Amino acid sequence: MLFRSQAAERGLHIHFDVGDVEAMPYGDDQFDVVSSTFGVMFAPNHSAAAGELARVVRPGGRLGLACWTPDGGVGDMFKLLGRFQPPPPEGAGSPLAWGNEAHVRELLGGA
């Protein structure tokens, strides 16, 4: 709600959606820019999420991601907490993997 009110105050015509990054309700090549700030990294199925990101951004469009890295402070916290928590569901990727450039390149392939 805060973002909506800030956009309206600035006269920006922005539409905000909340949905499932693994199954976005948008057409192919619909956006010039697709961005995720600490969002897509929590999708359990990294391949499905990356496929959707690549599908909805137009050819030549931009994809911007902000994600935690495995080597930073949050990565250290994940390692520590991981010793005391049950493992993630089978097949679920670590959110920290999105902070690894090689992983993201592999997910997106030639996209």
Regions picked out by a protein language model, each given a short descriptive name:
Residues 1-2:
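Short, small-residue-biased leader/transition segments that mark boundaries at the very start
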Residues 34-35:
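Hydrophobic beta-strand segment of the Class I
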Residues 25, 44, 73:
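Glycine/Thr-rich phosphate-binding loops of Rossmann-like dinucleotide-binding domains
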Residues 38-41:
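Short catalytic micro-motifs in class I SAM-dependent methyltransferases
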Residues 47-48, 54-111:
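Conserved catalytic/acceptor-binding region of the Class I
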Residues 10-27:
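Conserved SAM-binding strand-loop segment of SAM-dependent methyltransferases
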